[in-house]
């Protein structure tokens, strides 16, 4: 037999065969398309055109306006959702270097005091807004964090309210009541009610813009009350405010000011009472920048106040960071607050929460958290600061559960009992407290909750040095205005003014600049020029008093003496038309 060739056959065909195949393929595709058209497989659905509103419709203009309003509202909701997505993306990227942080790296050392001054000015502005809220309010609600009520109290705020007058009444509001066990909530309410009226509250965590839910304190199933995102305690708080307006027979609306430290839930409280998102809220402290007025109804008006950060801690900045009074991104040293967290929390809980192996020190803990969460710098180095910010964020968000217990009071210190008895008549407290017990009983116990108990922090006070600096800055500004008006002083007065200006940085720079050789001092030149002008004018006035006759030529020369000497050389007096011709 003849062996078959191992070479591959050629794929070359004649042109007749090639065009025959192409024709058959074309006919096949044509037939398939025809069958699909008959069955209607690839037919596009017919878009029905909107006929619009007929012209004969009597309310066409009103309907068109309503459509425009709905369209604008839909666009606004889309923009708000975009902003919410951006905020969530920022939270996910927590710990990375922000744009503002990169800007500060490029700044010089001379620019750093300016940044500090801007921050101080904003804190002073918040303090002024607090004073306004206290002056305008009839009832002041101080919002406290139920996890650490004593640590989120500010005694200076309470003192300001008490000194504002006898018509100002302070009420303590224990917010975030769902984050603590039942035993701690009951003891804290008893402790605080010995000084002022205190109300328990849980803000709504729903995300829709309106119709936020409330849960009544008279619910049939108290065990299911805290499993929802609805608001709790709103009916008791409104009843408290209505009782006050009835007891004083106020015909006008009652103004309620809401004060407290940053991120205790002041804006969330207003949204929960209004049952709509009327005020911006967020987990970052300092979101509210100015006083905001919200009308709850025709009888109650709410005033939202920015959280005051002019605080003086008994310990260090780490304790203020753990109370979420400062932004985590702005902390210079985020590791030191994490050291405090490791002292308070057991290691087993942190190991199970972050799913890391056992650790020994703070650096080891942060190193393992950074490797698990993927926080790395350039070159594969572990970012310790980013891991510390993650832990701080979890602490402030409540992912690391903790609570405190109230301290024991001294037996002799019951000076506030008179205040409580007087306020009990105004607010009808017994009736309000009776309706509150149902949802407090629905809180989880210590065994069910299993949080970390930590020692209670002391109350915070204002930094008095910053308040004193504010009064000093006002006096310095007045002195600067006076020095600007007195530019014409000469000799010794000019040297004294120079000494006062040298205190500022710009004054010192100007002194060095004008002290150099071949440097023109414009201010000194202006002062000398004015001095010469005054001297010439005084001499001319003396000559006028001596001469009785008035001479127009002499008077014209006197007026020209006030001008620059450069323009007086060979200057002729235009007397044509004034004197008779000879």
From Swiss-Prot:
Localization per Swiss-Prot or TrEMBL: Nucleus; Nucleus, Nucleolus
Sequence segments annotated as region (Acidic): 463-551
Residue stretches of biased makeup (Acidic residues): 476-496
Chain segments carrying region G3: 304-307
Chain residue ranges for the region called G4: 175-178
Residues involved in GTP binding: 175-178, 263-268, 304-307
Free-text comment about domains: The basic domain (B) allows nucleolar localization in the absence of GTP. The intermediate domain (I) inhibits nucleolar localization by the B domain and is required for exit from the nucleolus. Exit from the nucleolus to the nucleoplasm requires both the I and the acidic (A) domains, and may be triggered by GTP hydrolysis.
Cross-referenced PANTHER family: GTP-BINDING PROTEIN-RELATED, GUANINE NUCLEOTIDE-BINDING PROTEIN-LIKE 3 HOMOLOG
Stated name of the protein: Guanine nucleotide-binding protein-like NSN1
Residue numbers spanned by region Intermediate: 281-456
Assembly description: Interacts with EBP2 and PES.
Sequence motif Nuclear localization signal 2, residues: 22-29
Function statement: Involved in the differentiation of epidermal cells, probably via the regulation of the expression of meristem-related genes (e.g. CLV3, STM, KNAT1, CUC2 and AG) and of leaf polarity-related genes (e.g. YAB5, FIL, AS2, PHB and PHV). May play a role in regulating cellular proliferation. Necessary for flower development, probably by preventing apical dominance through the down-regulation of AG expression. Required for embryogenesis, leaf and cotyledon development, as well as for leaf polarity establishment.
Region annotated Basic, chain positions: 2-49
UniProt main location, coarse: nucleus
Compositional bias of kind Basic and acidic residues: 497-506
Residue span of motif DARXP motif: 145-149
Region (G1): 260-267
One Pfam assignment: GN3L_Grn1
UniProt short sequence motif Nuclear localization signal 3, positions renumbered to this chain: 69-76
Disruption phenotype: Dwarf with severe defects in reproduction, eventual arrest in embryo development that can occur at any stage of embryogenesis, distorted cotyledons, and upward curled leaves probably due to disoriented leaf polarity. Ectopic meristem-like outgrowths on the surface of cotyledons and leaves. Abnormal expression of meristem-related genes and of leaf polarity-related genes. Heterozygote plants develop defective flowers and siliques on inflorescences sometimes terminated by the formation of carpelloid flower, and thus leading to a highly reduced self-fertility.
Motif interval(s): Nuclear localization signal 1: 5-12
GO MF term list: GTP binding; mRNA binding
Organism of provenance: Arabidopsis thaliana
Region (G2): 286-290
């Amino acid at each position: 037999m003849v062996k078959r060739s191992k070479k591959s056959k050629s794929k070359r065909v004649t042109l007749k065969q090639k065009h025959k195949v192409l024709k058959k393929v074309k006919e096949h595709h044509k037939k398939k398309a025809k069958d699909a058209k008959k069955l209607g497989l690839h037919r596009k659905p017919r878009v029905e055109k909107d006929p619009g509103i007929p012209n004969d419709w009597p309310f066409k203009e009103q309907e068109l306006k309503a459509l425009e309003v709905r369209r604008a509202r839909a666009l606004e909701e889309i923009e708000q959702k975009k902003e919410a997505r951006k905020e969530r993306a920022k939270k996910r990227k927590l710990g990375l270097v922000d744009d503002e942080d990169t800007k500060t790296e490029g700044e010089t050392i001379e620019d750093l005091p300016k940044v500090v001054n801007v921050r101080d000015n904003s804190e002073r502005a918040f303090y002024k807004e607090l004073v306004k809220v206290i002056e305008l309010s009839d009832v002041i609600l101080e919002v406290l964090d139920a996890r650490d009520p004593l640590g989120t109290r500010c005694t200076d705020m309470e003192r300001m309210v008490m000194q504002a007058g006898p018509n100002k009444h302070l009420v303590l509001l224990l917010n975030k009541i769902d984050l603590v066990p039942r035993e701690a909530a009951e003891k804290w309410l008893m402790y605080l009610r010995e000084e002022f009226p205190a109300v328990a509250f849980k803000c709504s965590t729903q995300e829709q813009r309106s119709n936020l839910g409330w849960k009544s304190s008279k619910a049939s199933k108290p065990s299911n009350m805290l499993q929802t995102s609805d608001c709790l305690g709103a009916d008791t708080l409104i009843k408290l405010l209505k009782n006050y307006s009835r007891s004083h027979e106020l015909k006008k609306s009652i103004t309620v000011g809401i004060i407290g430290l940053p991120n205790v839930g002041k804006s969330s409280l207003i949204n929960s009472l209004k049952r709509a998102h009327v005020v911006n809220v967020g987990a970052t402290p300092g979101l509210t920048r100015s006083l905001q007025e919200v009308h709850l109804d025709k009888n109650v008006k709410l005033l939202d106040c920015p959280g005051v950060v002019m605080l003086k801690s008994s310990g260090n900045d780490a304790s203020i960071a753990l109370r979420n009074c400062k932004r985590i991104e702005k902390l210079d040293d985020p590791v030191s607050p994490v050291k405090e967290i490791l002292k308070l929390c057991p290691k087993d809980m942190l190991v199970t929460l972050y799913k890391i192996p056992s650790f020994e020190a703070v650096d080891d803990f942060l190193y393992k958290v950074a490797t698990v969460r993927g926080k790395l710098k350039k070159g594969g180095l572990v970012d310790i600061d980013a891991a510390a910010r993650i832990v701080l964020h979890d602490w402030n968000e409540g992912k690391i559960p903790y609570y405190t217990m109230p301290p024991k009071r001294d037996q002799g210190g019951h000076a506030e009992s008179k205040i409580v008895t007087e306020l009990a008549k105004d607010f009808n407290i017994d009736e309000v407290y009776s309706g509150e017990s149902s949802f407090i009983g629905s809180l989880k116990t210590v065994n069910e909750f299993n949080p970390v108990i930590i020692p209670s922090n002391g109350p915070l006070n204002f930094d008095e040095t910053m308040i004193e600096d504010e009064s000093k800055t006002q006096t310095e500004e007045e002195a600067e205005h006076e020095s600007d008006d007195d530019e014409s002083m000469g000799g010794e007065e000019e040297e004294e003014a120079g000494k006062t200006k040298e205190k500022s940085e710009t004054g010192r720079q100007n002194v060095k600049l004008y002290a150099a050789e071949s440097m023109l001092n414009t201010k000194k030149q202006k002062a000398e020029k004015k001095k010469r002008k005054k001297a010439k004018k005084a001499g001319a006035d003396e000559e006028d008093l001596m001469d009785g006759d008035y001479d127009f030529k002499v008077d014209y020369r006197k007026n020209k003496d006030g001008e620059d000497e450069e323009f007086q050389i060979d200057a002729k007096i235009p007397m044509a038309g004034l004197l008779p011709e000879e």
